[in-house]
Amino acid sequence: VYKRQIMLLDKSGGNIDSLQYVKTWDASLSIVIEGNENMKAYLWCEVMLGQGGETYLGDIASDTIYRINKKTNGLFPILLRTPSVRDSEGGKYYLRLEGVTSRYYFLKCQISSLDMTDMVIKDDKSYSLVYDRQTGEIFRPTFRNKDFPSEEWSYTMRSNGEKDCVYQTLESFALKEALEEGQLEGSLKTVAQGLDEDDNPVIMVVRFR
């Protein structure tokens, strides 16, 4: 495993944090297996996130998520988690910044310990959160496509991607099955009618108004 020596310098107070408590740039998830509790899996988490022309710093070992000023390289705190990730209770999950739009912060509460039974990893405790920058509300989002209303879908936000949009990957074979079952409507139905089951996935771009 490649390791880098990293320190955090407070430009205003001059204090230096050795960050010795940062074990890795990846989230280490402990997977419990019957008869073998020493096995671990590793989930890669992006530390620097570019969204809408801005850059954000969200290390999973830190309680604070920052926006970076490109001109001064200053760090401006935007979100603070409680309890601390270094507390026994707070250490049960990692908080990840997944994306930013003009109005929302998209977050993921990733549980730090997973159960694995019969070679199947079970993760039913991790969940997504959205912070409304206008109202200060925090809620768990549910996304549905009006052309595929029976299916709840997950999103992907690309680092340095286009401002105020998310992406969804739709497998061609799944769209063909949904088409045959009469679950598709509108533009998505038209797209599915022109697909073969072994075609490449369809990438849908969702723009926030």
Per-segment meaning from a language model:
Residues G161-R209:
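Blade-level signature of beta-propeller repeat domains, shared across WD40, Kelch, NHL, RCC1
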Residues T55-Y56, M116-K122, A192-D196:
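Short consensus segments that form the blades of beta-propeller domains
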